[in-house]
């Protein structure tokens, strides 16, 4: 178990909002919808395109894969924001900081999304969604809302009435692994039409659409 805190963070103070880089957080409609792989694929794309990029793992699998990060669920709630803030501040010299997302604001069993939003003072968000999910995976009585409403929720919460950076959802990472190639293409096309955002499955089609969206939007 790698979920052992390596430092005792200070209480977060919003310092990350003063940084001049892009802080990209993957947020989700549920747990386990592809937030980690999306962040890693965008990070890889950024490096291949000569962008100075860093990746911050926030869960045990991400830490195991990359060899560093913060085990967010090992921190007491009041210190979780500070842990995220401290890691982001350490990456102040990187142009892009990809933060591995955790949980979902829609999930009643998740408390992880807000500390990452607040601690990183995120500037860009990628919404991650399973194409075959109409409800939460483990709470099937909870329907996933229209994704435009989910986008509005994350953007409103991130800015907190304008006192934090006005973070935008700049693209959607659609997990289509349960769909055949024809259904996957239709799902991507439908979401692009209904949200006016770039949509891709980063495993099936690559992350370029999302990387370009981050690059173009300040």
Which residues are covered by each model-predicted region?
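Flexible phosphate-sensing "switch/lid" loops adjacent to ATP/NTP-binding sites
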Residues: 5-25, 29-33, 37-218
